[in-house]
Each structure stands twice: as structure tokens, then as C-alpha cells.
């Protein structure tokens, strides 16, 4: 699949005036997963949590309504949804009339599930309904205070040393230094990366260097998280592992992929850059 031909990315686009699900562009997960050595159903679980901040439609009398959208796409769906197409799809509601928020919610659930070829949860919140969520991720130890020398800016698992000893720890780590790039436009994507694990201790300076090594990598948010998850799982085989990235907002959307080897929902908390 040639992404440049089949997506809206990098192209001038007229914004829609009428609701249509045809704006949604699905991209098979399998294509990027092949580059990670994955075929068939992956061993991890998780979801892609999207927040939509620019969402509006007209009620039956023509008065605008606004909402915040929370969309959860399971990682075992066949497709991701390309982000600009998601934005255009949401914009297509702007001048269309609907009888209720519940009608819009049900329609989005149907359209997004069809595009993703998997279950999608949709929750529309009024501006006054939204509340920040508590989360254990907020207590993560931030690695960015470490003073490291860096000269590798493409993903390099060899930066991670082999595990040493038999000690077992359980801890949550984070870094605000994750940067990856859109595979079509090259536009930078910025995120805070979280890692929770139980297993042999990770060498923290080396882990930070590995995170920084993603800096020139080109891939979608979802697959960057899967790459980090698989690298850590294959190298250290921890008993528990969860990798969660909260990306900064673009086009009224932020994308927050979570991958783990145990059941875990993506907490929807806000960071200063979101």
C-alpha cells in the first residue's frame, strides 16, 4: 500500500460540509507489524486511545452542539485509522443536523468500527463533563534527569545491555523525550513514553538512549509503541510489561497507544503538552 496515494496526508484538502464516513482511511496494521517480525495475532493486548477536541454538529433546530470525543480502538482490530482522515471525518459533522448526542455517538461507533474492522468505543462528553483521571502513570520515575551522551538517532536495540543478575523489581519509568516522525510527511510527532514492568532491572541510562534513538524513525504512533514494547519484551522477557505513549495534539486529536502483556486499560489523563 503506497501511503502517499491512499491517504490525505501531505495533500491540500477541501474541508467537508456534510457528514460522510467516506473520509475515513483505514491502514492495515499487518503491514507495519511485518517489519517487526509479527504475523498473525500478536501476543500483546492494548488499545489506541484517541481524544477529539474539535467536535461539533447542529441540533434539529440548527443550533451548534460541541463535545469532547473519547475513542478507544482495540489493538486487535485489523486497521488503524489515518489521523488526517479521522480529523476530516469529524469535521464532516459540523454542518449536519442530528437529533441528539446519542445519535452522533452511535453513528461514530458504527463508522469507526467498520473502518477499523474491530470494536471501537465512543464516548462524547460535554465540555463541563470532562474530568482529568487519576493514574499510577503519573508517579513514574522520569529518566530525563540522567546526564547521557547520545549520538544514535535511529532505533537501535543494541543500546540496551543484556540483563544481569537474578534480582526482580517492579517499577514505572517515563521520558518526555520520545520523538518519531510521520511516515508520509516526515512531520515530527512528540510524546511522553511510559514503561511499567516487573522483571530484571532495566539499565536506565541505556533505556533513555534507546528511547532517544527513535528520534529519526518514521512510523505511525501505534507502531512506534509496538516497536518499543517488542524490543523490551524480546530482550528482557519481563513477567509484566506495559508501554504507553501519550502523544501531543495535532489537528484537534491526540493519540495514546498502550500495549501490554496483561489486561490494562489506557488511563485518560492530561499532560502539560496535551
Swiss-Prot record:
UniProt keyword terms in alphabetical order: Cytoplasm, NADP, Oxidoreductase, Queuosine biosynthesis
Disulphides: none
Pathway recorded for this protein: tRNA modification; tRNA-queuosine biosynthesis
Domain of life where this protein originates: Bacteria
Keyword NADP attributed: yes
Residues annotated as binding NADPH: 83-84, 250-251
GO molecular function: preQ1 synthase activity
Main location: cytoplasm
BP-aspect Gene Ontology terms: queuosine biosynthetic process; tRNA modification
Catalytic residues as annotated in Swiss-Prot or TrEMBL: 182 (thioimide intermediate), 189 (proton donor)
Binding locations of substrate: 81-83, 221-222
Catalytic activity: 7-aminomethyl-7-carbaguanine + 2 NADP(+) = 7-cyano-7-deazaguanine + 2 NADPH + 3 H(+)
Compartments it resides in: Cytoplasm
EC nos: 1.7.1.13
A Pfam family reported for this protein in Swiss-Prot or TrEMBL: QueF_N
Family listed: Belongs to the GTP cyclohydrolase I family. QueF type 2 subfamily.
Role of this protein: Catalyzes the NADPH-dependent reduction of 7-cyano-7-deazaguanine (preQ0) to 7-aminomethyl-7-deazaguanine (preQ1).
Quaternary structure annotation from Swiss-Prot or TrEMBL: Homodimer.
Listed name of the protein: NADPH-dependent 7-cyano-7-deazaguanine reductase
